Amino acid sequence: MDRPNESDDNGLHLFKYSVQQNEPIDKYFILDSKNRDYDEIKKIGKVIPYKSLKHRFLGLYAENIITSHPDNGIIYPFWGGYPYFAGLLKSNNIFLQHGILKDDISDWLNKKNMNLSFFLVSSEKEYVSIFRHHYNYDEQVIQLKGLPRYDNLQNVEDKHEIIIMPSWRRY
C-alpha cells in the first residue's frame, strides 16, 4: 500500500507487477474508497477499502505488509487502539520508501520505532548512510534493491523534451 489517499507510489507499482506473477499468494492493495483511482485499480487486482472491516481482519493476519509509508497509523487499521493490538500483529513490515533518503531521519525510522523486516534503499550512499546514522538495523534488513516505480520507467529515445522537476527541498 501507499498512503490511504494516494495511488501513485511504489506500493502501486509493486502491486501491478505482483498481480502479473503466477504465485499462489493473496495480494491486496489498501486504498481509501473515495480515491479517484479506486475503481481503476480494482481492474488490476483486489483492492480493500482503507479502514474497512476486511482491512482490519487482513491487518491482523497478514504475513507481509508492504508499503511506501511505514507509519503504524497507515499500515495497521486499529487507529487509537494500536497499543492493544501490538502484540497480536506478527506481519513482516517491508518498507519500499517513496524516495531516496537525503537526511538522517533515524529518530523516526529507527528499529525501535518501526521494527522493519526489510528496508529497501536505492543507492550505495543511501545504504551506507543507514549504518552511519542510528537506525540500528542489521545488515540483512537493509536491502539495496531500488524503487519499483523506477523499474516501470520506459526509455523513449525519439522525444526531445526537457523535464523540470521542482522540489520542496532547500538544497
Give, region by region, the residue ranges found by the protein language model.
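Conserved donor-binding/catalytic core segment of Leloir-type glycosyltransferases
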Residues: 156-171
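Active-site and donor-binding regions of nucleotide-sugar-utilizing enzymes
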Residues: 1-153
